Swiss-Prot record:
Residues annotated to bind Cd(2+) 5: 48, 52, 54, 58
Job description of the protein: The metallothioneins are involved in the cellular sequestration of toxic metal ions.
Protein name: Metallothionein 10-II
Chain sites annotated for binding Cd(2+) 1: 15, 19, 32, 37
Matching InterPro entries: Metalthion_mollusc
Length: 73
């Protein structure tokens, strides 16, 4: 039986404080909203307000690049 936080085995992405870095392996399909994802390899979804789009290499609100006048959350 796979570990519940092993996204690669279970094919379910768990973005939760209940998943520590131990045994938690997320693939590219794992996208979490916010900084609550404790899994290594999880991609954080970057959302920009309005019709703005995030720049490349965005890993979270702190490194989110949006068009001028747009805020990231």
């Amino acid at each position: 039986m796979p570990a519940p936080c092993n996204c690669i085995e279970t094919n379910v992405c768990i973005c939760d404080t209940g998943c520590s870095g131990d045994g938690c392996r997320c693939g590219d399909a794992c996208k979490c909203s916010g900084a609550d994802c404790k899994c290594s390899g999880c991609k954080v979804v970057c959302k920009c307000s309005g019709s703005c789009e995030c720049g490349k290499g965005c890993t979270g609100p702190s490194t989110c690049k949006c068009a001028p006048g747009c805020s990231c959350k």
